[in-house]
Amino acid sequence: MKPGLEQFFYQLDTDRIRFTTLIPPKSEAHELADELFNFLFPVHCHHPRPARVQYAILRDDLEQLLRPLLHDKNGAAVKLADAFFARLPEVRETLLGDAEAILQFDPAATCLEEVIATYPGFYAISMYRIAHELHRLGTPLLPRVFSEYVHGKTGIDIHPAASIGHSFFIDHGTGVVIGATAVIGNNVKIYQGVTLGALQVDKSLADVKRHPTIGDNCILYANSTILGGKTVIGHDSIIGGNSWLTASVPPNSVVLHQPQVKVRTKMVEEPWNFVI
């Protein structure tokens, strides 16, 4: 064996030990994410256990994931796991309100059970609210592992640090991006491709509000982009599809993207104007 490989193997082993204290095992974290969803909404459980039994198992699973991340100082993993599960009844009530909002607004939805069992938007919102509680409690990295797991499954990217009010609605959802410092009010509806992003990306802005604020009762239609920490969309506003906003709009606004339509005749040859 070449001497260089020994050093290479040593570095890999060192990194492996370091990563186990910084990053929770993805497969176990992903399984816990789905089990938490099924605990709150047992629509996919073929052999459901009593809630007390599920609670005991899930609480232990969460504690085991937290121990290396928190270095288990003064029983920190136990305290955090207990605090998280104490919040779950309220989280579930909020999520039922989200599901009801989807049912009431989406003409394709036939019942609450359909929304809970099949809608990717509801699944993404559910995992956001779970991850957000862990984030609020100071959990390192695990909330991001949850959110990126859901991102991969649904195409919906919601940072767990974002603040989102009740009765939240995401329809279709693919391509939705909601940044870490975004603030979304109550009864807000978002469609596929919406971005609530930052005007610029710089490490020095880590502690600065970089993402927009969306007021109550707003509707953001497909592929609208709203950027900037100082950008505020006033309550009861409608942002039309493909709109691009970097400045605030007052309450009750309607923002539309007007496409240009040019009618050409067969007599006029189309110019070659390819841009690569």
Where are these regions (language model features)?
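Structural signal for interior beta-strand "rungs" in well-ordered beta-sheet cores
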Residues: V150-V263
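Terminal amphipathic alpha-helical/low-complexity segments used for targeting or macromolecular assembly
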Residues: M1-E148, E269-I276
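C-terminal membrane module of polytopic membrane proteins
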Residues: A247, H257, M267-V275
